[in-house]
């Protein structure tokens, strides 16, 4: 049996074991997948101990350990290099620990699965944290014409843009986003968790907007999605599909088997809705 895990702090609410078990059942893999709560200063030791076990193939890494995982691993994956963050670790054939970042691929695949065209579109990315860093190179690889980063602290956005080192990436102050007139707006901040808006949706920022994407997911549309819909944006998407798609990419890296995610996204959404009703 192949062993996997997800490390985080907190980790109790993680859907990763459920999602990966669905993948395994679908493709005929026998796996175990556990949630591991690592101490904030003890991730490296905990991950090494898990990955040294017989049968251990790899693990996922969530907040706040993605930078620790990046520093721990041998990283050839461009998205992980750009993000300076790793969310997927795998034992290599030569005893080395390999690191990947599947967040951006997860976002791009979810957008494409939802019928969103990325090629030649102008993208506005709200936020400049780890979630934002991980999606920049995959969005550009998917053909985005430009990608503009807006953040409450403009200097942080400039730092992320500089690290991306691509002429298609630029920065705008959060209060000046109306000058961008993007086709796609992506919220990578946690604003929606507290029912706040990540940015103002007034002053013309939506004049050409076709899609808003919120990396947060709930059992109902976030305020960001609702407000955009009321202001005429045709398509609003939450981050649940991204969660499933980034997991599918990790599963493929580990097993070389690519699961069909369409039914799984629906099943996971049902679980989220039932869980939130109970709470």
UniProtKB/Swiss-Prot annotation:
Positions of NADP(+) binding: 127-131, 151-156, 215, 239
Subunit structure: Homodimer.
Pathway stated in the Swiss-Prot or TrEMBL entry: Metabolic intermediate biosynthesis; chorismate biosynthesis; chorismate from D-erythrose 4-phosphate and phosphoenolpyruvate: step 4/7
Protein name: Shikimate dehydrogenase (NADP(+))
InterPro entries assigned to the protein according to its UniProt record, in alphabetical order: Aminoacid_DH-like_N_sf, NAD(P)-bd_dom_sf, SDH_C, Shikimate_DH, Shikimate_DH-bd_N, Shikimate_DH_fam, Shikm_DH/Glu-tRNA_Rdtase
Entry keywords, A to Z: Amino-acid biosynthesis, Aromatic amino acid biosynthesis, NADP, Oxidoreductase
Function statement: Involved in the biosynthesis of the chorismate, which leads to the biosynthesis of aromatic amino acids. Catalyzes the reversible NADPH linked reduction of 3-dehydroshikimate (DHSA) to yield shikimate (SA).
Family: Belongs to the shikimate dehydrogenase family.
Catalytic activity reported: shikimate + NADP(+) = 3-dehydroshikimate + NADPH + H(+)
Assigned EC number: 1.1.1.25
Cystine connections: none
